[in-house]
Amino acid sequence: SRMDKYKSCHFSYFMRYGLQAEPRKPAGFTAPEYGTFVHYVLEHVLRDEMFRQTVLPGFADPVAGAEGRRRLRELTRAAVDRYVEEELGGLEHQTERFRYLFRRLLRSVQAVVDNVAEELAASQFRPISFELGFGSGQDLPPVELTVDGVTISVTGFVDRVDGWVHDGRLYLRVVDYKTGKKSFDLTEVWNGLGLQMLLYLFALEARGPDYYGQPVDGAGVLYLPARDAVVKGSRAMTDEAWRKQLDRELTRSGLVLDDPAVLSAMEHDALTEPHYLPLRVNRSGDISGSIASAAQLGRLGNYVDKLLRQISHEL
């Protein structure tokens, strides 16, 4: 995040991290607070054993999945209640407007949770790490490089890491929850922006075997929109129509490994009718979109390392 700030505007970087200047905090539930809220709910729901054992099995089935959806709502409500008590100290002392706005958010949060559950129910990839830290005293050491005789440490957190084991190798994808309109763009990467997820993926390829105890391959990176998506429609819009439009707002972006086995493991219908992955399939069955071969990912890793050294030298 700091690298993005530096590359986009040196002065903004100096104001924020040199002078520690911050904008005045408005009253209410701000976008960053909403992002923290969604992170909290998703992590607590996906970590829960009930989610793995009773929600996901048969979740995609319209009939058998009904019980799973009911349990998912219970898990979401429990996570929301915990957040309210732990982070907000309850709602009793909040203004009536704050409570009203917070209640409005609950529908969107449940829709995001439902969307993630539906994706995982149609996938063999499973969450294996949450808030995975790179840095001193964290899960993994920082990414370090020496430039001009000075060692630079890059630290941070991965929102979620999903894994799938195939032929004795662990395929990893990095998932980043985004509360804004951010999407993955290779043009930005070329200009030194949006390196965060790729940096984490390549670091996991290097350090993952020791951490996870088996050979590791990078399977890709995905931005998951976790914002309070605004759905435009009439008051007569049905819940089903509202959900379909919201699902479009929650479309993922990113870059995934161009390997049929990996793509099918990420999403069962990836090679025919992808719904969650940033792919397109034409009538001939040819796949296009945000895909890269293992060799292309390797070259991209070398380019990211070059950019890191350039940024470190400039700093």
Regions found by a protein language model. Give the residues of each.
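Structural signature of nuclease core domains in nucleic-acid processing machines
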Residues: 1-315
